[in-house]
Amino acid sequence: MIDTVHNNTFDAASSQEATCTEFMVPMRDGVRLATDVHLPAGFRPGIDAPLPAILERTPYGKRDVSRSEINRGEPAAHRGDIAAYFVARGFAVVFQDCRGRHASEGEFTKYLSEGPDGYDTLEWITQQDWSTGRVGTMGLSYAAHTQMAAACLNPPGLVCMVMDSGGFSNSYQCGIRQGGAFELKQATWAVNQAKGSQAVLNDPLLKAALDAQDLREWFSRMPWRPGESPLRFVPEYERYLFDQWTHETFDEFWQQPGIYAEGFYDTMARVPTVLMSSWYDAYVRSTMDNFAAMSKLDPVAAPTYLIMGSWLHGDRNVPFSGDVDFGPAARIEGQIAEDWLAFRAQWFDRWLKPATSGVKQSDPVARIFLMGGGSGARNGDGRMEHGGAWIQSSQWPLADTRFTHFYLREGGVLSETPPEESDASVSYAFDPSNPVPTIGGALTSGAPVFEGGAFDQREDERFFGTRNPGVPLAARNDIVVFETPPLEEDMAVVGPVVVRLWISSDAPDTDFTAKLIDVCPPNTDYPGGFAMNLTDGIFRCRFHNSWSEPEFLESGRIYEITIEPFATANLFKRGHRIRLDISSSNFPHFDVNPNSGESPALARAPRIAVNTVYLGTEHPSHLVLPIVPVNALRSLEALTDPNHA
């Protein structure tokens, strides 16, 4: 099938025609994947000089409008337009539907086929007479996961990658599960994307049945069970969702190349890579773990670069996240590059074309958006002005980082001074029928049930599970709050965050959660102040000794646990407070622990747990923050060189 694509969106240089030819590319098991190859109009394979290729593998439709290609002030672009842009610059462009999606054959099992299928696709590209055999990959979210999955198998032809907001380092700890709990974005994504499955697209009655499902109502009836879920009409999607949900221990299921780069770092493709994410994205930990590991593989021949913004998942040109505005500087355009297309074009020029391959650039290794420093007032769009600025570094964490302990003290105090009391503790009752509602955070794919971002931590009718609109979460009896006095000077927190607790419970299993908050003082616009969530995490206590061999708790026995919220970068201004909220649920971000020892995916007998956090000298529960001297921060150099990439 041949189409001609005309580009009317970008500059005149990309307006030349490009031809699009669809191929059904066979994989090693005989399943064929629908693959569009975009070449210059009139290109003669085998006669004209071959071209380097850019590959994106996606489950979202290779010919559909691409959410990942939104530029400021413009609607999302069609993938044909994106292809024409790169074709005009001397590349072949390949878009492919993932297995079981849209025009491709086979059954869709989320993530698990992407390694072998990516390998086979890259091998096919290298064998085509229009190809130089040099391939760069790109893509957002799932299309970043597909890149990392293929790279784990060290495929032929792979020369460089641009991974935006994805690429699992260890999906058991970020992206599917976290701290032993299940991330329920997998459930919302499955239901929403099942509507685009081949079975649903080919059956109007099936489509009507799936469209009729009220997902918010289904979330109020959790846990689901196989055959008793909104996915019961689309069994291949229900099957893979419950595989993820019920595989609670870290075993061989979680060690496959599509979801576990950690197990392949030593043998994976060593190629130049850009890793990009953002503080309210669901893949902060994956991005940071991948950066830490890949930076060491071959830093000279295969450098790895890090870009961390303030935005939600993939919203690189949106200056706000939730109810908080970070200012126009938060956009990638004009800060990191002229625009995202130009950034990638320069990147692929640098690594895929012989004339420019290997040319040295002076890019910072890490470009980080430091949130904070704004007025704290409400802007014209109704968002709190938190502000921020880009900084740069040659490493992560930053060189001058001082990892500082803040101890949880009696009376709700968070202090650098260790406790003096020997037996201090605080207890609360956790009722799984009344979980703490999720109010923002590092979330994606949650519509129509939940949303990510930065919000004042008070209940609001916008958020699923709200029972008392307008009331601060801190007023709940099952949340324990610790905060510093107002800061006497600005404090920059940039890096990984760790919460170490000594706990006990009268239940055989329970969860503990931790949320780091910047408490902005009261002002005219926010007379009650603004408690802005920065990052949070969770720990399922049956894994206190091992992720692979769970053990129930003994009632009353004290255990040490570690919660690892995602890394962050925030300037706490003078007069602000640092706050840590401890609780035992965060729903619907995570599934709710029934406290009974049952699997949360299948529980039938939930119970109330009395949970205790210890604060004394023998069990000094504490928060560890990465503090960087404000005067040691290096501002990102202004973008003046049009060839800066």
Regions found by a protein language model. Give the residues of each.
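Glycine/threonine-rich phosphate-binding loop and adjacent beta-strand/alpha-helix elements that clamp
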Residues: 3-8, 19-24, 325-343, 352-645
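A short loop-to-beta-strand scaffold at the N-terminal edge of the catalytic core in hydrolase folds
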Residues: 29-45
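Cap/lid segment of the alpha/beta-hydrolase catalytic domain
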Residues: 44-127, 168, 174-177, 182, ...
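Accessory cap/linker subdomain of secreted extracellular hydrolases
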Residues: 76-82, 88, 152-267
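Active-site-adjacent alpha-helix of alpha/beta-hydrolase-fold enzymes
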Residues: 78, 285-304
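A catalytic-pocket lid/entrance helix-loop region that shapes and gates access to the active site
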Residues: 138-213, 279-280, 298-346
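Short, proline-enriched alpha-helix->beta-strand connector loops that line the catalytic pocket
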Residues: 267-273, 302, 401
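Short beta-strand/loop motif that positions the catalytic acidic residue
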Residues: 275-277
